[in-house]
Curated annotation (Swiss-Prot):
It comes from the Bacteria. Keywords: Cell outer membrane, Chaperone, Lipoprotein, Membrane, Palmitate, Protein transport, Signal, Transport. It is found in: Cell outer membrane. CDD domains: LolB. This is Outer-membrane lipoprotein LolB. A lipid is attached at C18 (N-palmitoyl cysteine). Plays a critical role in the incorporation of lipoproteins in the outer membrane after they are released by the LolA protein. Belongs to the LolB family. One of its GO terms (biological process) is lipoprotein localization to outer membrane. It comes from Pseudomonas entomophila (strain L48). Residues 1-17 form the signal peptide. A lipid is attached at C18 (S-diacylglycerol cysteine). Pfam families: LolB (PF03550). The keyword Chaperone applies.
Length: 205
């Protein structure tokens, strides 16, 4: 079950890509809206990164933790998850129009989109969409969001499409202030992400 939740976590990351932003935002909190807009503009141009970290998942009948590697190069992604004590591993690679999932001891699966792969392999229909934005500390651009800013005009809390994201700490890397620790709360599932190493890149278009 933990591996299934890990696969779900990776799939959440892949729909929005690195397109422009323009969501309908309701902003509150301590921060300065103008500084937030400047921060958002900078991060929206960040279209490449490498992340190493840990992920923890808690669900009604299952919980666990594992390691995360995430390589993003514009619309190409390579996301790898490994469970504790080597119990299982999954690798998801692809770009728009083609996705491949490799699961240890289970095989290789392909689909046209992450959503299709999730439904085909796990039988779940979930709002697979926004983590590629959320991991940068941004709301996804194509739906309404409620934002709470911290005293540094960065996201402290985000509510969007039935999910709540809490930003617990940030780290500065290569001139970018990026989330270091965040918690995601969805329907019957909680995810904690701790980034141990951020390597951001602006690759251009």
């Amino acid at each position: 079950m933990f591996l299934r939740h890990c696969i779900t976590f990776t799939l959440i990351a892949l729909l929005a890509g690195c397109a422009g932003f323009g969501s309908k935002e309701a902003v509150q909190g301590q921060g300065n809206p103008q500084l937030w807009r400047q921060h958002k503009q900078q991060l929206s141009g960040l279209d490449g990164w490498q992340i190493n970290g840990k992920v923890g998942i808690r669900a009604p009948r299952d919980s666990g933790s594992g390691t995360l590697f995430w390589l993003q190069r514009q619309d190409y992604y390579d996301i790898r998850l490994a469970g504790p004590l080597g119990r299982g591993a999954a690798r998801l690679t692809g770009r728009p129009g083609g996705v491949m999932l490799e699961v240890a001891n289970q095989g290789r699966f392909e689909a046209d989109s992450p959503e299709a792969l999730l439904e085909e392999q796990l039988g779940w229909r979930l709002p697979v969409s926004h983590l590629v934005w959320w991991v940068r500390g941004l709301p996804a651009p194509d739906s309404k969001s409620q934002l709470t800013l911290d005293g540094d005009s960065r996201l402290a809390r985000l509510t969007q499409d039935g999910w709540q994201v809490e930003y617990l700490s940030y780290i500065e890397q290569n001139g970018y202030w990026l989330p270091e620790r965040l918690k995601l709360h969805g329907e019957n599932i909680d995810v904690t992400l701790v980034v141990k190493d951020w390597q951001p890149r602006q690759l251009g278009h």
